[in-house]
Amino acid sequence: MKVYVFIVTYNRLSLLKKTINSLRKQTYPIDNLCVINNGSTDGAYEWLLEQQDLTVIHQENLGGAGGFSRGVQYAYEDGADWIWMMDDDVYPESNCLEQLLKYKEHSLCLQSARYFSDGIYVPWGYRYDLSRDFEEKISADNYKKEFFSVNTGCFEGMLIHRSIVAKIGYPDKRFFITSDDRMYGYLASKHTDLILVRDARLNREATFGEVKYSPFYSYYLYRNFHLRDEYCKAITGKSFPLKVKMMYVLSALKNSLIGYSFLEPSLRKKMRTAIWKGFVDCLRKKENKTF
């Protein structure tokens, strides 16, 4: 059984080093540790050249979505049985992979339990209501169980078997960032009981209180609505309900015109502009890198 792990990175060399170090310490042996370098300009290229135990793939910046798509493609085509996906600002505990693989007979797609650096569990990224285009929070009660069923996952620690990749393909690089893992996990859940493993712990760099307002992220969240709608049509045979579309339009208009009044003026303007541009580019059905 061959287990491949890959990390997608872009201009976060100091964090990448920490992630790689945590993977080198895994109690379950990794057959191939790979880095997808999304065109970093912070010295990552030179540092990675010196690492003898890594497989490195350099490419232009195709966003997280393009990086994860390339990583899954590489691992699958190279014969991996299990593929573990990792971002460059998360640090799995030493037994994380071992804990995931304890349940490999139960599920062919398993999710690590993500925690903020201050010890609070991450409640998002595990359950998605496609009919409402709504991501539900996970309650703390779920963590009383060794594992529990979810219907989507996050590329921060998702472990997937090649048989599922054969059925659903590679992650969709058109998203560039955000929603790519949500839709990929949702597709996987149609073919296996996707579970979150409580003791497969993965720690994030950020704390729970570090809420960051990102024009970049917000743009793609709004722009990618049309791609999520495309998935809804493919899976259910129908587009998002009219109510969902109206809520999206109202949210875009509100946040681009009067939203984020609590932010300082410069950031507030950037957030509003990004959301408006994301809304317009959604109507134009733009894909890949557009911001």
Spell out what each predicted region is.
Residues 216-224, 235-291:
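Non-catalytic, C-terminal membrane-associated alpha-helical segments of glycosyltransferases
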Residues 18, 193-213:
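Active-site donor/metal-binding and catalytic loop motifs
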